[in-house]
UniProtKB/Swiss-Prot annotation:
<protein>
    <recommendedName>
        <fullName>Auxin-responsive protein SAUR63</fullName>
    </recommendedName>
</protein>
<dbReference type="Pfam" id="PF02519">
    <property type="entry name" value="Auxin_inducible"/>
</dbReference>
<dbReference type="InterPro" id="IPR003676">
    <property type="entry name" value="SAUR_fam"/>
</dbReference>
<comment type="similarity">
    <text>Belongs to the ARG7 family.</text>
</comment>
<dbReference type="GO" id="GO:0009926">
    <property type="term" value="P:auxin polar transport"/>
</dbReference>
<keyword id="KW-0927">Auxin signaling pathway</keyword>
<dbReference type="GO" id="GO:0005886">
    <property type="term" value="C:plasma membrane"/>
</dbReference>
<comment type="function">
    <text>May promote auxin-stimulated organ elongation, such as hypocotyls, stamen filaments and petals.</text>
</comment>
<keyword id="KW-1003">Cell membrane</keyword>
<keyword id="KW-0341">Growth regulation</keyword>
<dbReference type="GO" id="GO:0080086">
    <property type="term" value="P:stamen filament development"/>
</dbReference>
<dbReference type="GO" id="GO:0009734">
    <property type="term" value="P:auxin-activated signaling pathway"/>
</dbReference>
<keyword id="KW-0217">Developmental protein</keyword>
<keyword id="KW-0472">Membrane</keyword>
């Protein structure tokens, strides 16, 4: 897992690179929102899903281990973006579900199960010779 300090540094670097080509305008505060606007509220970071939906999260979400794992997976799959947004290899429905779990302050067991589910699902998309040795589990809440 990535420690919080390194993750904050990575997020700041991504934000700075993304901000080079756009102006920032403040708007009403919201904890998580989707938008087609190219501006982002101060104290938030933006990610895009695999289906091109834009999500803005408060920086405080970076301390959540599930969000850290998603960013780590994104970095492994897509690398650090030099130009353009951070893209997560998940669809918007999954990210909306994850946001609801985070907002409800999921307990430690749920968080561990979600992390296991993410890594299992990720392994199932790899070629047969590179598959992980973990067994797949279905996560239902």
């Amino acid at each position: 897992m990535i420690n919080a300090k390194k993750l904050m540094k990575m997020a700041k670097k991504w934000q700075q690179r993304a901000a080079l080509h756009r102006k920032r305008i403040s708007f009403q505060r919201s904890s998580v929102f989707t938008s087609s606007s190219s501006t982002v509220e101060k104290g938030c970071f933006v990610v895009y899903t695999a289906d091109k939906i834009r999500f803005a999260f408060p920086i405080s979400y970076l301390s959540n281990s599930v969000v850290q794992e998603l960013l780590k997976i994104s970095e492994e799959d897509f690398g650090l973006p030099t130009e353009g947004p951070i893209t997560l290899p998940f669809d918007s429905a999954f990210l909306e579900y994850l946001v609801k779990l985070i907002q409800r302050r999921m307990d430690e067991d749920t968080e561990k199960a979600l992390l296991l589910s993410i890594s299992s699902a990720r392994c199932s998309f790899q070629p047969q010779e590179q598959q992980c040795s973990t067994t797949q589990q279905l996560l239902v809440f």
